């Protein structure tokens, strides 16, 4: 649990300023002021040391949490079959609806259908939903290309 030093410092200052006999209001000499100043400086230095030590401790804990052990480091690249991420195809109707929303109705001539199918089914841009905007741009550029403009 981390406690902020400022409220504690203010509380100590208030406490030190009110300490004394409640009935007597004595004028304080320069020696009392110097000792009070020394106490405050020591208190501030202790708080700084505490916060620096606390942050170093947190950094050390953070480094050890993410470090790989000797066994983990050797096993990391061992089996490519287990580590391969399998991409699950999404609903193709949703893909089609989204691309039609971005591009509008597109027409591809029969000469261009082979290029369209290669682009639509085999590229990363048209198979991963995060890249559908790129796919829409590529499809519109293909549709307006001279090869595909012929009807």
UniProtKB/Swiss-Prot annotation:
One Gene Ontology molecular-function label: cytokine activity
Keywords assigned: Cell membrane, Cytokine, Disulfide bond, Membrane, Secreted, Signal
Compartment(s) of residence: Secreted; Cell membrane
GO biological process: cell surface receptor protein tyrosine kinase signaling pathway; positive regulation of ERK1 and ERK2 cascade; positive regulation of ERK5 cascade; positive regulation of neuron projection development
InterPro entries xref list: ALKL1/2
Subunit: Homodimer.
Stated family: Belongs to the ALKAL family.
Protein's job: Cytokine that acts as a physiological ligand for receptor tyrosine kinases LTK and ALK, leading to their activation. Cytokine-binding is sufficient to activate LTK. In contrast, ALKAL2-driven activation of ALK is coupled with heparin-binding to ALK. Stimulation of ALK signaling is involved in neural development and regulation of energy expenditure.
Protein name: ALK and LTK ligand 2
Species this chain originates from: Rattus norvegicus (Rat)
